[in-house]
Structures are given as structure tokens and as C-alpha cells.
Amino acid sequence: MGCGPSSGRQNPSTELKKSTRATTTTTSSSQRNNYNDNNQNTSSSSGNKKESSSSSKQHSSKKSKKSNSKKNRSPSPQPQLTIKSAILIQKWYRRCEARLEARRRATWQIFTALEYAGEQDQLKLYDFFADVIRAMAEENGKGGVENGRNSPLMSALSHYAKPSLMDSEGETVKKMLEDTSPTNVDIDRNYKGPTLSLPLDKPQVAKMIEAFKVNKVLHPKYVLMILHEARKIFKAMPSVSRISTSISNQVTICGDLHGKFDDLCIILYKNGYPSVDNPYIFNGDFVDRGGQSIEVLCVLFALVIVDPMSIYLNRGNHEDHIMNLRYGFIKELSTKYKDLSTPITRLLEDVFSWLPIATIIDRDIFVVHGGISDQTEVSKLDKIPRHRFQSVLRPPVNKGMESEKENSAVNVDEWKQMLDIMWSDPKQNKGCWPNVFRGGGSYFGADITASFLEKHGFRLLVRSHECKFEGYEFSHNNTCLTVFSASNYYETGSNRGAYVKFIGKSKQPHFVQYMASKTHRKSTLRERLGVVEESAVKELKEKLSSFHTDLQKEFEIMDIEKSGKLPILKWSDCVERITGLNLPWIALAPKVATLSEDGKYVMYKEDRRIAQVGGTHAQEKDIVESLYRHKSTLETLFRFMDKDNSGQVSMKEFIDACEVLGKYTKRPLQTDYISQIAESIDFNKDGFIDLNELLEAFRLVDRPLLR
């Protein structure tokens, strides 16, 4: 779908409101029923005509009357048989629908479990970094950091051991702005992408969008220009934005986009460009996971520059450099901008820290990315110096505090407020408790939502942060609304995207759903589900393969008779103990394991998929599987050390990262084996390891079946 200059006008015909679609479906169903009833009436009336004509010929004799009535009587419909057939068809349909729904839920559970397990790993890794930073600070006080700084990782971490940029550090900020100035970058003559000039206007933004549609890359000079201009606007805004719909009489809220540029185009095409009478709120997580994160970011920031009173951006948990290292945004920048990605990355860290953290609509609706906790207070959010939190994953350090106790108390309270509003999730249970599934933030129940809304005089809490199958979902007695705008989030056809429009003085919600895919209309629900299910099972098998050795040991312990098989129930208990993914393993067993002919046992010895790294044969299985299991963490470590975004790390950096990974996983890795693996990955033997080659070197292979 296009979203060029002409798409600024709203198109009411494309407003796919949920209520309208439901009414249309009901009307269509009633019309079909009336049509069937008319056919039945016509059939019965024609039968009556035949009966009357045949009876007029039966007055000649009683015998002929009886015989003719039996011969000429048309077969009358049998209501009982018709009803039974209809009931049987309904049962078949409902069973089929129930099976599809069960498969969909199991698939969804796999995707979410793997996603949240990755987020847990990321937060654990950052906790580990925090411990290292603390140790560095202690060593620094003793004057013994020289050895630590020789380590590539220690050198990278030294940047994060310093406090975040503050207004009082004017020279530091000034130098950063000078180093990232667009005037430092020249435009090559061969550049054929979109061009921009200040002041920006909607036609320029429209041309930029059209260029992005055909995969043209915006020149880094223009990227830096947009970031600098957007930074000025965000810096002047309060931590909590407040907007009024008295003029527009409506407001549109969009959830996570995660680099899905096609979804952003659909939103602008269906709903029009932001304007005074068509304001927008984009509720965080603009980047990561999708392949066009920088394009999404440039369009949103450009729209803010054009009309800052018509579009409001809230910060999400992925507007964070540490998250970007793991989930793809830094990799995307390195691929598209090579060496020039370094100043862009440095400036983005600062710009993200200036994004507002929440928005209030007419003192009635509270909009925040993640959610709330029992400690969340708007008055505290208003006063938070948000720019101190370049990463929300750790509390900032302020050297200006008089005592360490005062420093800890003040910063931790502010940090907890920030962490909760960006990482929390609603639950049906009452109360508030730590969000252990994600590893950060809180779970909050309906009572917490009700208390927060009543305390602040709000009617509704709108948040994002969670992928929903339909693109949105109400919870907590319709007082908490989740909106997620990235369609096909896990896989093509996995979910719809949606946005919500609050219209009128009563601000009634109207939902617009969509799916940015050209193929989903041509395939059936069963076919789409099959594709998504296949993708989920493939990822789950890869995850299980990374636990192969641990699983086999556990299976052998439980297999007292050494038969090479286990009952499905025992097998599922073993898998859950080792992986901790909290999945319906009994239902998933036929898809991820080999079963006996009667389907009662899992033949665990026939699991032949093992992890392999590089081409070396002298491998220690425990080391290889540990590296494979934590390959995302290893990639994060590499990108953390790759300060110049060259995409390469030295052998020393590789060995250092693996040793750090061993400390992080509390399973020390032997240097000899790490060196063998490193040599096998260094295909051109230049002493450097390319990150892309490293990730390609991780693979699953089928081992020979032992007889």
C-alpha cells in the first residue's frame, strides 16, 4: 500500500472498525438464512401444487386414487434428519476450529517463551556487566585497574562505568554534538537516495517514504540532521506529555512497530498524516527485530520536526543501546552505514534518553509503553531527569551526591519508576510482584490498575509492549488496553497489527486491524497456521539442541531400565527441568521428538541433532553447546567490544569474550578448546573473526546413529 503525498487525506472507506465488520458479518448471515428459507418455502409450495393436481385425477376410482397418490406424491423434507445433519456439521466445524485454536495457542506459547527467555538472558548479562562495573570502580579506588583495562571487554565497559551525560557536563555534551554534526559528513556524487533540507516539510517526508519503499538508504548526513533537530524538540519537552483533543476531537494511538516499515506505511495510508485535527501517539519500541528500524525512526522523527504538536513519541524498553546490541538495531546500522554508523549510534544513545516516558490525554487516559506497579506515581514521573537513563537497565551513578547511601536511595527509586513503566505486564491475579518471566519490571493485577486510575482520576490505561494475536486486547475489566502495531511479528501470518482511535468527547475506542503481507489473503487459515507452527517448532528444536548433552544425561538417569525410551510424562518433566521454558511438552512431544509406534514413549536415543561450531573435529561437547546456547549473548559481547562497528573482532577479543561468557554462565570454558574453535571460524586466517561468519559457523548437524 502506498502512502505518498496524496495519502494525507483520511479515507473513511478504509476505516475497518471492529463494530462495523461485526455488523456486516451478521447482516450477511441473516441474508443467507432468509435466502435458504425462501428456497424451502418455494420447494414446499411446488410440492403442494403437485399434490393438488394429482388428487384431481383420483376421483375415477378408489384403487387408482390410492396408487396414484403413492406414485405422484413428492418426497417431503424430513425436518429431524435436516436438524441432525446441521448439528453434525456444526460439531465437525467446532472440533476443527478447536484443534486449530489449540495449535495456534501452543505455537504462540512457544514464540513468547523463547522471546522472554532471550530478554531474561539480556537482563542477566547486564546484571553481570553491573557487577563487573562495580568491581572496576572498587579497583579504580585502589589504583589497580591497569590489568583490567588491557582486556577488550573491560575497555568497553569503562565507558559505562561513568555516569550518564548531565547538563552540568557541558563540555562532554558539546564535544559529542560536535563529533556527530552532519557538517562532518560529505555526500558522495553517486548517492541516489532521498535528499532533505531544513526546514523539513511534509512533501520532503513523503518523498523520503517513497524512497524507503524501494529500499533506498538515507544518507548518514541526513540521518544525523534529523537526529539533531529531533533532539532539540525532545529536550524541550517534559517527561510526561499532556495533550488535549478539544480541537481534533480524536487521537490515534499506535503500539510497537519494531522496525516494521510496511506497517507504518499502512497506518499513514489508512489514517492520514499527523496534523492538528489528526494527532498521533506512538507508544515506544520503534526499533529492533525488524529490518527497517532506522527508516521507521527517521520517518517518525521527521514528522515530529514538521509538526511537534501533532505527534507524540513515548520511549519504550527497546529505545536503549544495550537492547539494541542484542536485538538487531546496531547490526542494521553497521550494515547500512559501515564506519559512519559510529557517530549515529553515539547520538542515538543521547536522543533516546530525551524521549518522553508517558502521555496523558485530556486528564482521562494514561498512555505508557509497559505498564505500572504499585509504586508508580505521575508526580514522580514528572520530576524524573529522564536523560540520565541512557540505559534503563541500570540505575545511573551521580558523583555529585554527598554520600553513597543518599546516592543509592534517590537513584534507585527513580530507576524503579522508569523500569516499571517500560517493562511491566498486566496479569489477571491481584497484587504486584516482580516480572520474573521477562526479568525486569513488575506484574500488576486489576486491583493495581483500579487503584492507579482512581488515585490519578484516569479512566483508562493504554500500553503496548506485548504482541497480541488480534493486535489489541482489553484486560482488567476493560480498564487496561494493550495495542500492538507490528503485524507478522513472529512469522508471516502470526498476528495482526492494530491501532486505536479515540473519537468524540466520550473518546470511544475504534480499532483498525491490518496485516502487512501480500500472501495471507491467498492462503487459508490452516495453511497460514501451518507456516507459523513450522517456524515455531523449528526454533524450539534449535533451543532443545543447545541443551542436548544435559537432556541426554537427565534422560539416562530417569531411564532405569536403560531401554532408550521414556514415557511421555517423564520425558516432559525432564525437558521442563532442564530448559525452564514452561511449555506444554506433552502436546509438543510428537513435533519435537521421536515417539514409539504406540505413541506412549519418547525414543530419546534417536535424537541425532547436535550443535557444532566451525569445522574443527576436536571439540568438547559441553563447550560447543554452551557457546551455541548463548550465541546471542556472545554476539552482544562482540558488538559491545566492537567500538568502531567494523563487524570484526580479533582472536584475543574472541577468547576474552568466551572467557567472560564462561564466568557469566558459571561454567568455565577451557582456553585450548576455545582457541581451536576460533581457528576453525577464522576462515581466511587473517587473525580476525567476522561477526557474520561467526553466526553462520553455529549450526546443527545430524550425528551418525550409533548401532
From Swiss-Prot:
Keywords of this entry: Calcium, Cell membrane, Cell projection, Hydrolase, Lipoprotein, Manganese, Membrane, Metal-binding, Myristate, Palmitate, Repeat
Amino-acid positions noted as binding Ca(2+) 1 in the UniProt annotation, renumbered to this chain: 642, 644, 646, 648, 653
Biased composition (Low complexity): 21-58
Cofactor note text: Binds 2 manganese ions per subunit.
Pfam families: EF-hand_7 (PF13499), Metallophos (PF00149), PPP5 (PF08321)
N-myristoyl glycine lipid attachment residues: 2
Any single biological process term in GO: detection of stimulus involved in sensory perception
Region (Catalytic): 205-518
The keyword Lipid metabolism is assigned to this record: no
GO terms of molecular function: calcium ion binding; iron ion binding; manganese ion binding; protein serine/threonine phosphatase activity
Binding residues for Ca(2+) 2: 682, 684, 686, 693
Active-site feature positions: 318
Reactions mediated catalytically: O-phospho-L-seryl-[protein] + H2O = L-seryl-[protein] + phosphate; O-phospho-L-threonyl-[protein] + H2O = L-threonyl-[protein] + phosphate
Disulfide pattern: none
Expression by tissue: Expression is restricted to neurons. Expressed in AWB, AWC, AVA, AVB, AVX, BAG and URX neurons and in one tail neuron (at protein level).
SUPFAM superfamilies in the record: EF-hand, Metallo-dependent phosphatases
Domain IQ: 81-103
Compartments, record wording: Cell membrane; Perikaryon; Cell projection, Dendrite; Cell projection, Axon
InterPro entries (alphabetical): Calcineurin-like_PHP_ApaH, EF-hand-dom_pair, EF_Hand_1_Ca_BS, EF_hand_dom, Metallo-depent_PP-like, PPP_dom, PPP_phosphatase, Ser/Thr-Pase_EF-hand_contain
Listed Gene3D superfamilies: 3.60.21.10, EF-hand
Function as written in the Swiss-Prot or TrEMBL entry: Probably acts as a protein phosphatase.
Protein family: Belongs to the PPP phosphatase family.
The protein's name: Serine/threonine-protein phosphatase with EF-hands pef-1
Organism: Caenorhabditis elegans
